[in-house]
From Swiss-Prot:
Descriptive protein name: Cytochrome b
Cofactor field: heme b
Family annotation (Gene3D superfamilies): Cytochrome Bc1 Complex, Chain C
Assigned protein family: Belongs to the cytochrome b family.
Lineage: Eukaryota, Metazoa, Chordata, Craniata, Vertebrata
Cofactor binding: number and manner: Binds 2 heme b groups non-covalently.
The keyword Phosphoprotein appears for this protein: no
Amino acid sequence: MTNLRKVHPLFKIINTSFVDLPAPASLSSWWNFGSLLGVCLAVQILTGLFLAMHYTSDTATAFNSVTHICRDVNYGWMIRYAHANGASMFFICLYMHVGRGLYYGSYTYSETWNIGILLLFATMATAFMGYVLPWGQMSFWGATVITNLLSAVPYIGTELVQWIWGGFSVDKATLTRFFAFHFLLPFIISALVMVHLLFLHETGSNNPTGIPSDPDKIPFHPYYTIKXILGLLFLLTALSTLVLFSPDLLGDPDNYTPANPLNTPPHIKPEWYFLFAYAILRSIPNKLGGVLALILSILILAIIPLLHTSKQRSMTFRPLSQCLFWLLVANLMALTWIGGQPVEHPFIVIGQTASVLYFSTILILMPLAALAENKLLKW
């Protein structure tokens, strides 16, 4: 008798995606982050659902409702901190996943890559709106500063900002709509994940060598399910350590002060995972220029397939490109650090230098290095 998982209409889909899926035999741990992102999304949706049961999206009660969750709800503090730190884990996995794609040339699967960029934007939007919900000082002022960036749009900027605010400042209407969208977007992300996987399974996975692996495939289960479980254990260990021992490590102390429109915090900054983009935004003195640089710092990923000049797909056998890749990683870390510093000398100059280096590495240096490698390897 044929196995049920191979004939049942629903189980068949799961079977071809996670059980009998032919996978390259040489996948390294860098291929773990896709499954870890799935786990992160599930954790965020579950913890978020329980938080939404107790949260009220009203300016008068939002801050107090979060306090109530932490003090009075059974394990509410744990759910809240799992959600907040789960977002940090989500972005760590996201950046690792994107970095893996850049290093091993996975961006040549253009549909999968473009859906991935959409997913990145959707996740960033969700995280930004989630940061506003506790209605602390940094929530309020972060929302004010970031939404105000839209006023740089020529001609319709001011109207656009007021339309998003639902008034003349960040207020009750803004908080209510941000809560609605923060609740809705993860489900849209889940749907996009399905499309992401659909396109990936059209081509099959890339592998560390960048060479087609059709002659050498192994079943996904048990080889990669056990590998994914090991990665999951590492993720859950890191997350629970953060939640149970140092839940506020990555947060901002200002967010424990209720939002006050009359009192501006000395340093307004977003969560750590947006600091690199925030540093690029602040590096440009012109408002519209800064906003464009901010958007392009992420959107630049979309043109990376067009900038691929190497005859090889992966960077595994390309030492020059490897050096530039790790320079880019170090540069992003420097930008993250600068984004958290005040706008004063020498941080301004460091931020501007790192921003120029970020764009020039991707747009000029990496394509040139790839061409040089083609010559060196006589390809």
